[in-house]
């Protein structure tokens, strides 16, 4: 079995996690699930970076020790990944004793090899970036030298330092990237890296004496004033977490196929420093370095000073974990910057998740129950729908091909093209007409095609939306496993099925007409204030009705037995409803824009049973179905538990 490693960067504990951290970690979790289904033994590693001058300063401001401060923030990161149900195998902290031993041992190896030497460093140091700036690159403004990367003021420092001979690895690095053109994705990021290397590499300062919070040098170096600088310390986590130099469980076997997920701001460190360190230690180089962009908020870069830093956990609690996963992975081409807005999130939920996929499953389950008592045979699919089946398989294979290329948005786009195709096929074939015309064999072939396509799609959907995919597969009495992936997704085996009802995959969300800006009250808050004010306002006398009037209204539980469209009307449906009276009542209801007729059969509803009969479009209506409508959609009111048709509601 192929062993592999998928990593996030270890997150710096100078602040709590935000949506950028969540995005990186969700990508890693997606790849873990994708490659696990393909049969790989994947080790998914994340963690926290806890050393450095910024941590020392942040702890001092809070009257804490650096370790106590790091403990508190690291716990927040770990708790957030647990909230998101992320399937990580290791959570490393650079304050772990085993990591410290690994870094010290690696330092000794590199020193004895001659790749580390002692010297002195003079330059403008940026505390925020934890690095020195070349004087020629720094921006000299009003006698202040600003960091060219973050534009914060730097400090002129001169200190003794140990250096790594990065300059010796220019050619090996260029040779590696020439032989492995897709080692960095997107590929244009690799071109940036090779261009930087070709300009010439300077040796790298890897220790500091200006602060104490870091890993001390090995005792045999006899140089206690030095601590290992953040990048040698931090990058070695990918090896120390697997037991490098102390590998009792043979975890380092995963290291030979490593995929690192990083943001574009730390590309240089991972694409130049890290492979050079690996070459020095005679360790295998990574298989892929996958580099994503940044998220802005309503077009503005996230900033604590602007108050627009987004907490991914709060968003997920409001809109759903699966829904947020889908949005982040679908909305933006991997590698590019993306803009987050609640309005766009809601549009994705309603259009793609609720309408395209959720309603498709609901319609299928309703028709399978109505026409075939949940049981579908696949034997006639190829006789009636061979071209359609081939089309579905072509789209699924195409979607699958995008994941190893890190084109995750395209994979999801193609996957949802399957659902769009199936919805259009229902509209074209009109299964209710097939049933009316007694074309039972063709109808069963159509529904079985849709069922098999949905089942097969669930195995790719699983990487992106695991809980939704499991629910989808469960509707077809199938589990998401590597064996079933081989059987249904790769081999495209068609299956006779007994379908089972499942709760809706998604819920429709209310649209936000005006997006929330930093410093403004949210739409949710405004709505709550309006609601509170409305509740506090006294009712006008003419709005009251007496209890005797209310008692006249007879509301009963009804079971919809039949549902049909009414010719020449796009709003009305003809429903036959069982109210426990020994006959079916005909009720004309204006819900055709929100419900397909076949999806209503078998649904429990609330009916005003003693309404005076009236004619609508020439059809007699003997009651009213109760529903609730907002500005965008309508929903039927149903009992939360199954009741006997005709039960009186009081």
Swiss-Prot record:
InterPro entries from the UniProt entry: Met-tRNA-synth_bsu_C, Met-tRNA_synth, Met-tRNA_synth_2, Methionyl/Leucyl_tRNA_Synth, MetRS_core, NA-bd_OB-fold, Rossmann-like_a/b/a_fold, tRNA-bd_dom
Main subcellular location of this protein, as a coarse class: cytoplasm
Cofactor binding note from Swiss-Prot or TrEMBL: Binds 1 zinc ion per subunit.
A single cellular component GO annotation: cytoplasm
Subcellular location: Cytoplasm
Binding-site residues, ATP: 304
SUPFAM superfamilies in UniProt: Anticodon-binding domain of a subclass of class I aminoacyl-tRNA synthetases (SSF47323), Nucleic acid-binding proteins (SSF50249), Nucleotidylyl transferase (SSF52374)
Catalytic class of the enzyme: ligase
Cofactor: Zn(2+)
Span of the annotated motif 'KMSKS' region: 301-305
Family of the protein in this entry: Belongs to the class-I aminoacyl-tRNA synthetase family. MetG type 2A subfamily.
Function per UniProt: Is required not only for elongation of protein synthesis but also for the initiation of all mRNA translation through initiator tRNA(fMet) aminoacylation.
The protein, known as: Methionine--tRNA ligase
Name of the gene this protein is made from: metG
């Amino acid at each position: 079995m192929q062993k592999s490693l998928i990593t996030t960067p270890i997150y710096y504990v100078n602040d709590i996690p935000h949506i950028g951290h969540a995005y990186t970690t969700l990508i890693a979790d997606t790849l873990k699930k994708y490659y696990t289904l393909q049969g790989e033994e994947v080790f998914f590693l994340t963690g926290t970076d806890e050393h450095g001058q910024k941590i020392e300063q942040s702890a001092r401001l809070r009257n804490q020790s650096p370790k106590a401060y790091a403990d508190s923030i690291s716990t927040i990161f770990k708790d957030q990944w647990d909230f998101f149900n992320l399937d990580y195998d290791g959570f490393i902290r650079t304050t772990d004793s085993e990591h410290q031993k690994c870094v010290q041992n690696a330092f000794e190896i590199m020193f004895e090899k001659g790749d580390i030497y002692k010297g002195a460093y003079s330059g403008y140091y940026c505390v925020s970036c934890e690095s020195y700036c070349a004087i020629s690159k720094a921006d000299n403004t009003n006698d202040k030298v600003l960091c060219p990367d973050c534009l914060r003021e730097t400090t002129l420092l001169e200190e003794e330092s140990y250096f790594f001979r990065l300059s010796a690895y220019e050619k090996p690095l260029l040779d590696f990237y020439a032989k492995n053109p897709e080692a960095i994705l997107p590929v244009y990021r690799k071109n940036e890296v090779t261009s930087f290397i070709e300009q010439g590499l300077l040796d790298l300062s890897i220790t500091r004496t200006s602060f104490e919070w870091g890993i001390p040098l090995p005792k045999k170096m006899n140089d206690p004033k030095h601590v290992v600088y953040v990048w040698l310390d931090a990058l070695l986590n990918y090896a120390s977490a697997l037991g490098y130099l102390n590998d009792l469980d043979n975890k380092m076997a995963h290291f030979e196929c490593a995929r690192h997920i990083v943001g574009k701001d730390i590309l240089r460190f991972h694409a130049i420093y890290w492979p050079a360190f690996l070459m020095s230690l005679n360790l295998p180089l990574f298989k892929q370095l996958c580099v994503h962009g940044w998220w802005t908020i309503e077009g503005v870069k996230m900033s604590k000073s602007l108050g627009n830093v987004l907490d991914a956990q709060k968003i997920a609690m409001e809109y759903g974990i699966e829904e947020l996963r889908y949005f982040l992975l679908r909305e933006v081409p991997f590698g590019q910057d993306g803009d987050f807005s609640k309005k766009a999130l809601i549009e994705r939920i309603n259009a793609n998740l609720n309408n395209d996929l959720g309603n498709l499953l609901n319609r299928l389950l309703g028709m399978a129950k109505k026409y075939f008592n949940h049981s579908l045979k696949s034997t006639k699919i190829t006789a009636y729908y061979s071209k359609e089946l081939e089309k579905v398989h072509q789209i699924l294979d195409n979607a699958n091909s995008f994941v190893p290329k890190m084109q995750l948005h395209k994979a999801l786009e193609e996957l949802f093209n399957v659902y769009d195709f199936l919805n259009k096929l229902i509209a074209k074939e009109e299964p209710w007409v097939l049933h009316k015309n007694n074309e039972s064999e063709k109808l069963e072939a159509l529904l079985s095609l849709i069922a098999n396509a949905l089942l097969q799609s669930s195995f790719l959907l699983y990487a992106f939306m695991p809980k939704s995919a499991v629910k989808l597969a469960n509707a077809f009495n199938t589990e998401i496993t590597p064996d079933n992936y081989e059987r249904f997704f790769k081999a495209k085996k068609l299956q006779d099925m007994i379908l089972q009802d499942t709760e809706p995959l998604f819920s429709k969300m209310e649209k936000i007409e005006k997006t929330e800006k930093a410093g403004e009250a949210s739409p949710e808050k405004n709505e709550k204030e309006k609601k509170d004010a409305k509740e506090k306002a006294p009712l006008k006398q003419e709005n009251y009705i007496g209890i005797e009037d209310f008692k006249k209204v007879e509301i009963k539980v009804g079971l919809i037995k039949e549902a049909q469209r009414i010719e020449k009307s796009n709003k009305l449906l003809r429903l036959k409803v069982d109210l426990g009276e020994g006959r079916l009542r005909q009720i004309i209801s204006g819900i055709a824009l929100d419900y397909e007729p076949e999806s209503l059969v078998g649904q429990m509803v609330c009916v005003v049973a003693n309404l005076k009969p009236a004619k609508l479009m020439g059809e007699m209506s003997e009651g009213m179905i109760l529903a609730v409508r907002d500005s965008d959609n309508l929903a039927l009111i149903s009992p939360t538990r199954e009741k006997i048709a005709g039960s009186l509601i009081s």
